[in-house]
């Protein structure tokens, strides 16, 4: 289907393995059936294993993907071998320039096949990828991914578990969106497993077509192990994989505090999580024992240490909300590559045509809501509501709304955004003159980001929305003080002098 993830076929790795002949003669296996060896830009040695039913030989292919016929950066310890098991030591000189590759031709028993060796360029950054992969579960990472996808023109492969977040048919043609059976709901565990295998196959296809390709992975920080599982574990050199770990929202900050907020366990926890990551085979691929359900891709404890490794970064709304008073963890925080990027900044930076495409992807009617804000010359104020478990809670919310209208109604048009589960506010427009009720079921984050220049004040019940809103836009909160807020809102608002605390 147009704009949907194409059905990916498993590559027959004929370039690395001779299949059994029709008469049943044994096959030759190169590197246990893989068809390439990928290493970083440093001077390194690797191995190619050969398991052959007859004597074999290996030569450099004349074309070598545009390189010299006999590159001086690649040395083989043997150019022929006997039947049975053999090993070839492959030595790479340090690469001071662009990525390079060469094709080795193995001949055995009258059959010839190619094996690719490649060496990455040094110093490539997060803007270097030739192909992008986006995998997300939470809403916030999905929105980040959609915004970034529209900021470049590279081929992209996309999966988001909350299928209703975007309309897959509205993605650009260069983006292949993995389909789900229920586009109004969530991807099933079976669909996530199938998606993962399809993504891994596509990565190997791209590597076979373009052995020096650089990959970009944008992934929930809670699923950051996919940077290893999908790429490095399949043999792709980690320097060719630029991983942006996207904040899942409050979980990013709360998990950091839970893991490293206790001085008695913080250092041990950090070292334990670091040891798990470093136990992986980062130089040549391999497989770390899987200790989690594969359909969840979970790696909650890894993103913080991973952000200290090359080619990994943690992108979040506000890095200053990650803090520690313990010297050991404070030092580790300083070593973490964190980028504070607000989604509205990504949206603002897009060309107008790309903004409109994002709104279509997100099923957001910009013109409709912008029109509401332009109906009068007054400034615009939004109140954020909450859910309720009692009549008293419903009455308290109504009292807050009445107070805000009395306090600001003469200078502001008042808009109320109910919680999706709140039905008590349905009668507010009749009860409170001049109040406009916004839809409870709407992409509210996108509403705020898209119309930020038209929103003069926002406030209400504590919400994760405030993490991605400029602090100077927040005028009031329905709470006693910052200390009573959940993390990281307690840190965000502890020095906010402009916020009025209402209880």
Label for each model-derived stretch:
Residues 88, 98-110:
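A short beta-strand micro-motif common to beta-rich folds, especially ectodomain repeats
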Residues 53-89:
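Surface-exposed binding patches on compact interaction domains or structured appendages
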Residues 272-382:
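A nucleotide-sugar donor-handling region in carbohydrate enzymes
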Residues 131-170, 174-309, 464-467:
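Active-site and donor-binding regions of nucleotide-sugar-utilizing enzymes
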Residues 21-26, 33-64:
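Solvent-exposed, low-complexity, repeat-rich "mucin-like" stalks and linkers
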Residues 13-38, 109-126:
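Bacterial Sec-dependent N-terminal signal peptides
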Residues 192-201, 423-470, 489-493:
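Donor nucleotide-activated moiety binding/catalytic core segment of transferases
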Residues 356-371, 381-422:
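Conserved catalytic-core segment of nucleotide-activated headgroup transferases in glycan assembly
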């Amino acid at each position: 289907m147009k704009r949907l993830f194409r059905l990916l076929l498993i590559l027959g790795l004929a370039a690395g393995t001779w299949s059994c002949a029709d008469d049943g003669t044994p096959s030759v296996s190169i590197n246990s059936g893989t068809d390439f060896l990928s290493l970083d830009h440093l001077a390194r040695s690797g191995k190619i294993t050969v398991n052959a039913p007859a004597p074999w030989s290996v030569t450099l292919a004349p074309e070598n993907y545009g390189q010299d016929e006999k590159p001086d950066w690649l040395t083989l310890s043997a150019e022929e071998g006997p039947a049975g098991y053999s090993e070839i030591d492959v030595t790479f000189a340090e690469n001071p320039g662009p990525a390079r590759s060469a094709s080795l031709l193995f001949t055995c028993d009258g059959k010839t096949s190619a094996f690719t060796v490649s060496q990455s360029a040094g110093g490539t950054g997060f803007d270097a990828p030739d192909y992008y992969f986006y995998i997300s579960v939470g809403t916030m990472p999905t929105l980040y991914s959609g915004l970034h996808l529209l900021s470049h023109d590279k081929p992209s492969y996309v999966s988001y578990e909350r299928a209703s977040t975007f309309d897959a048919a509205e993605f650009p043609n260069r983006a292949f969106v993995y389909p789900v059976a229920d586009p109004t709901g969530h991807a099933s565990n079976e669909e996530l497993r199938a998606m993962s295998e399809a993504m891994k196959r596509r990565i190997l296809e791209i590597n076979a077509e373009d052995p020096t390709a650089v990959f970009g992975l944008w992934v929930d920080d809670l699923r950051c192990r996919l940077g290893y599982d999908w790429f490095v574990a399949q043999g792709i050199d980690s320097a060719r994989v630029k991983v942006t770990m996207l904040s899942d929202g409050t979980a990013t900050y709360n998990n950091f505090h839970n893991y490293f907020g206790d001085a008695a366990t913080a250092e041990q926890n950090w070292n334990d999580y670091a040891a798990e990551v470093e136990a992986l085979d980062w130089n040549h691929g391999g497989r770390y024992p899987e200790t989690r359900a594969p359909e969840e891709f979970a790696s909650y404890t890894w993103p913080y240490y991973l952000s200290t490794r090359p080619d990994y970064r943690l992108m979040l709304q506000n890095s200053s909300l990650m803090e520690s008073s313990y010297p050991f963890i404070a030092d580790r925080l300083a070593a973490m590559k964190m980028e504070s990027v607000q989604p509205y900044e990504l949206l603002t930076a897009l060309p107008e045509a790309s903004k409109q495409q994002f709104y279509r992807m997100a099923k957001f009617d910009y013109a409709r809501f912008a029109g509401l804000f332009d109906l009068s010359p007054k400034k615009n104020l939004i109140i954020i509501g909450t859910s309720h478990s009692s009549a008293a809670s419903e009455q308290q919310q109504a009292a807050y709304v009445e107070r805000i209208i009395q306090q600001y109604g003469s200078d502001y048009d008042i808009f109320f955004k109910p919680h999706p589960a709140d039905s008590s506010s349905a009668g507010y427009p009749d009860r409170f003159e001049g109040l406009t009720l916004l839809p409870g079921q709407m992409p509210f984050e996108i509403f705020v980001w898209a119309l930020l220049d038209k929103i003069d004040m926002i406030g209400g019940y504590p919400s994760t929305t405030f993490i991605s809103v400029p602090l100077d836009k927040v005028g009031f909160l329905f709470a006693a003080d910052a200390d009573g807020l959940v993390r990281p809102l307690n840190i965000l608002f502890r020095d906010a002098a402009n916020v009025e605390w209402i209880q």
